[in-house]
């Protein structure tokens, strides 16, 4: 399985890091990190973004339109934008492919490949909601990283694992990162 993971400039880069850790031995992962996300990685995780880069099979700069990822002829199974800033959400919803992250999402939509968008904002305004609805109507899976509490999380890692486990479910990757409903 070939998955493109895109990290944008919103809070919640811990979700991306954990997803990459879990996918490392399970899929070919192409990674794109926006410039804002590079700063947020340092702020939230106290690590250099290059540490995140090491978790991927391949890495591409967000302005690299000569990347093989920039073409619809490049085969991949899914794109996950985690976290997804409202700027990126708007660009994807409105077809404004000004960078490689938005371009690969545009390709996923036009080629009918799996696109998971994980918007990280609170509260949402009407524009955010309209953009999410537009993407959902186009076939994207809009998946805000909202944890469950029926599984009685003991710490932040349990909360992160629930969200990442649900992403893996949508990707069709078996996992036991969290306790499922009815097994608690």
Curated annotation (Swiss-Prot):
Keywords carried by this UniProt record: Flavoprotein, FMN, Prenyltransferase, Transferase
Domain of life: Archaea
Residues that, per the record, bind dimethylallyl phosphate: 150, 166
Catalytic activity: dimethylallyl phosphate + FMNH2 = prenylated FMNH2 + phosphate
Single GO molecular function: carboxy-lyase activity
EC number(s) on file: 2.5.1.129
Entry-linked InterPro entries: Flavin_trans-like (IPR036551), Flavoprotein (IPR003382), UbiX-like (IPR004507)
Binding site for FMN: 9-11, 34, 85-88, 120
Function: Flavin prenyltransferase that catalyzes the synthesis of the prenylated FMN cofactor (prenyl-FMN) for 4-hydroxy-3-polyprenylbenzoic acid decarboxylase UbiD. The prenyltransferase is metal-independent and links a dimethylallyl moiety from dimethylallyl monophosphate (DMAP) to the flavin N5 and C6 atoms of FMN.
Similarity comment: family membership: Belongs to the UbiX/PAD1 family.
Name under which the protein is recorded: Flavin prenyltransferase UbiX
Name of the gene: ubiX
């Amino acid at each position: 399985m070939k998955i493109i993971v895109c990290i944008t400039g919103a809070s919640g880069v811990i979700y991306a890091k954990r997803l990459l850790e879990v996918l490392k031995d399970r899929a070919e992962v192409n990674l794109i990190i926006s410039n804002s996300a590079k700063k947020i990685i340092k702020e939230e995780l106290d690590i250099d973004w290059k540490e995140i880069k090491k978790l991927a099979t391949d890495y591409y700069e967000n302005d690299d339109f000569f990347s093989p990822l920039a073409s619809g002829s490049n085969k991949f199974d899914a794109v996950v934008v985690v976290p997804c800033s409202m700027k990126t959400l708007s660009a994807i919803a409105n077809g404004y492919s000004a960078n490689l992250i938005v371009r690969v999402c545009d390709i996923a939509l036009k080629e009918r490949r799996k696109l998971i968008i994980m918007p990280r904002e609170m509260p949402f305004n009407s524009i955010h909601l309209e953009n999410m609805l537009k993407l959902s109507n186009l076939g994207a899976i809009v998946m805000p990283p909202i944890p469950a509490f029926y599984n009685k999380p003991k710490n932040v890692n349990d909360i992160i694992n629930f969200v990442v486990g649900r992403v893996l479910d949508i990707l069709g990757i078996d996992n036991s990162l969290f306790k499922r409903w009815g097994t608690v």
